[in-house]
Amino acid sequence: IGEPNTAYAKYFTGNSYLASVSREQVNISNVTFEPRCRNNWHIHKATKGGGQMLIGVAGRGWYQEEGKPAVEILPGTVIHIPAGVKHWHGAAADSWFAHLAFEVPGENASNEWLEPVSDEEYDKL
């Protein structure tokens, strides 16, 4: 499941684990979330291209864009996240969850980390 995700722990509620899959051409990481773990709302920014793609590989999780209903992620589910979209993703309350995260190449790409997903918001899932 990778190593404890200490470098990004301040952007997560709960414990997550990170395993690098590739750093050539496209950055790909396997991210594993314990039950109820989720990352903060965030935005992948780029002046051209950019964004992220998630592929569920184990367990059950959630993806949500601001202002839209949450989408369940199961093994094989593919989520395309365009640059500039505020969103979060993480595990279901009753399941460990893992996804592959692909960083879509872009110009001047960066992440803007925002507020945590509150327990009140999360518990509505």
How would you describe each model-predicted region?
Residues 16, 20, 34-55:
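Catalytic core of non-heme Fe(II) oxygenases with the double-stranded beta-helix
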Residues 24, 34-36, 56, 66, ...:
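A short, compositionally biased micro-patch
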Residues 18-20, 28-32, 53, 70, ...:
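Conserved hydrophobic/aromatic beta-strand scaffold that supports enzyme active sites
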Residues 62, 74, 83-111:
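Ligand-binding loop in jelly-roll beta-barrel domains
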Residues 1-29, 40, 110-125:
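A short, N-terminal "cap"/entry segment at the start of jelly-roll beta-barrel domains
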Residues 24-26, 34-38, 60, 107-108:
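Short, charged/polar surface micro-motifs in flexible loops or helix N-caps
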Residues 38, 48-75, 85:
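A short beta-strand-loop-beta hairpin characteristic of the jelly-roll/cupin
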